[in-house]
Amino acid sequence: MKFKLTIYLLLKYYNLIETNYKIGNVNFGSEDATNFFIESLKKSNFYLEYGSGSSTILASNLNKTFISIESDKNFYNFLLNKIDNKEMLNFKSLGIVGDYSTPLFFNIRKHFLKSKVIHYVNDVLDTLSKSTKVPDLILIDGRYRVLCSLFLHNFFINKKDMPLIIFDDYLNRDYYHVIENFFKIRMVGRFAVLEELIQNDTRHLISKYTLDAR
């Protein structure tokens, strides 16, 4: 079974088979969370998301300026055909991935993925550091969510304005709650809304969370 799955994921990675993804309307598990995201996106002038999907299509349909970071090559190619502003969709490879962009054979490969992981999390921030324009809305909904939060903390800690940062699937996932050492949060449905930065050193956790793809 694992052999068949590996072959399937290899074929998918190299776009040798057609995958029919079903993307519905934006749904974050509750009316409160879904409406909060939609209204926040409508107000946004510049939106960044880690993890693509229905939110990407909505941002495109609303003619928003946005950057979407996607690590599943096959899904990235699928989305390219769904949006007009293709340059706003960015592929950052984590190699061959399975469901929800989890790297294949992660426990074996996690130490070898470190360079790719840093590119996935930080390339967009490196680009933004050279720009006068920064996002006012950020959705963390892809891989390496704690690491994304730590890098965002470091990026915005000395900036004048703090964006609205939404961390999806935070409710009931205790392994994410370490970020409360770095952000003051409030809950909206399953979202943690990161509202205020806390001055703390992230360096001791960066290496740890480059090995945690959750």
Where do the model's predicted regions map?
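Short, flexible loop segments at the rims of nucleotide/cofactor-binding pockets, characterized by
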Residues: I23-F28, S44-Y47, F112-H119, I138-I140
